[in-house]
Amino acid sequence: MKVRAVIKLVEEDGWFLDRTRGSHKQYKHHFKRGLVTISGNLDYEVPRGTLNSILKQSGHKEILER
């Protein structure tokens, strides 16, 4: 999955961009706790372990089971 697709998934769930430093983007949610950090160029492929971590942070556990 590309970084662009991960960002789209997170934003559709209500997360919004809070801050950026270099290639790292941190997203916040109005109701959910914590931050979701996504790094890399938009066209980069996200490694499987990193993708699992991002999905756990954002609360998308159902996607992990697929």
PLM regions: where:
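Short secondary-structure junctions
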Residues: 14-19, 62
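Active-site beta-strand termini and strand-to-loop segments that position acidic
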Residues: 27-31
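Conserved beta-strand positions that form and line the central face of beta-propeller blades
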Residues: 26, 37
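C-terminal structural segments of small proteins and small subunits
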Residues: 34-35, 41-66
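Generic signal for short, ordered secondary-structure residues
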Residues: 10, 33-34
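Amphipathic alpha-helical segments
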Residues: 2-14
